[in-house]
């Protein structure tokens, strides 16, 4: 939401990768259903969001893949592209700011890039924030999310909205495919 506000864009195109995934990833169905719930619950500005899957797969090639996906999104008509701290990297294989350094070496790709470093939750300020060593900073971990579902442990609402958790737990109870095996 911060990126949408800062970019002054007219809307948000949510374009998750829906192709082949690795073991342990959430299934495409769970990812798309989660976004549909967020849209239905008006988490995003009303009538300003489009959801469409990007039928490719992660190559785990860090900065090179960030360039590829940015160009693909530009070709889909996007004016901005968000790049996270470790965009399709493999744990700590790439340096923390390697994406940004790599993009700075290139000429204009004709798409505005929005870079994010490590994000977490500041429990004192009750909002998401860039990484800090503060005791009030709570890290977000995909591994912790997966583990919580395997042990049936509820996550705080700031970590994952309860509507999403409820949907995933229901799918697990229905023996639906939640994680790639």
Pin down the residues of each PLM region:
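Active-site cores that bind ATP or allylic diphosphates and position pyrophosphate for catalysis
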Residues: 1-181
